[in-house]
């Protein structure tokens, strides 16, 4: 155990966050997502909600402010502009941890799958809400 670090951040996830560099992406996905077949390192967070894991990650990892958008969700199938309550929760987390970077962009389902294949790692949660999938692009920590 460590002080001031969310216990949802397992040793494996902490090591992954530390190893990631500027511009690397991390996918945090729901229980229905085919994480094991993504071809990426899969970190299990069974029993955890995607929003709780995202909050823990965002408490330590800066988002990329060199790009127009650093956070992405999977669009609702057959409804490119469809909004779900979980998307509002993602936005609230972005506003809390990265107020200047609170933009959240939807990506078509199959394009999302392809993007996840390029992510540094995938965190597979126990989230049961549909479309509980999020990609975060790592930024930089500026010197004090």
Predicted ranges, named:
Residues 1-46:
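Long, hydrophobic N-terminal alpha-helical segment
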Residues 1, 5, 45-49, 78-82, ...:
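Catalytic cores of large soluble enzymes that bind and process phosphate-bearing ligands
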Residues 6, 10, 14, 18-22, ...:
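Generic secondary-structure signature for well-ordered alpha-helical cores
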Residues 24-27, 41-42, 64-74, 101-103, ...:
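Structural motif
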Residues 78-144:
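Glycine-rich, aromatic-bearing surface loops/beta-hairpins
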Residues 45, 54-93:
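Glycine-rich nucleotide/cofactor/substrate-binding loop typically near the N-terminus or early
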Residues 24, 30-32, 40-56, 60, ...:
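Conserved mixed alpha/beta catalytic, RNA-binding, or beta-rich assembly cores of soluble enzyme
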């Amino acid at each position: 155990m460590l002080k001031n670090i969310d216990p949802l951040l397992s040793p494996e996830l902490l090591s992954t966050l530390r190893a990631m560099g500027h511009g690397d992406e991390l996918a945090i996905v729901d229980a229905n997502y085919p994480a094991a077949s993504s071809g990426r390192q899969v970190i299990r967070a069974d029993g955890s909600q995607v929003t709780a894991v995202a909050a823990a990650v965002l408490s330590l990892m800066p988002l990329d402010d060199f790009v127009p958008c650093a956070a992405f969700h999977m669009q609702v199938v057959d409804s490119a502009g469809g909004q779900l309550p979980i998307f509002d929760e993602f936005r609230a987390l972005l506003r809390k941890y990265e107020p200047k970077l609170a933009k959240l962009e939807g990506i078509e389902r199959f394009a999302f799958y392809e993007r996840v294949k390029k992510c540094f790692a995938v965190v597979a949660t126990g989230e049961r809400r549909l479309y509980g999938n999020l990609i975060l692009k790592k930024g930089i920590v500026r010197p004090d």
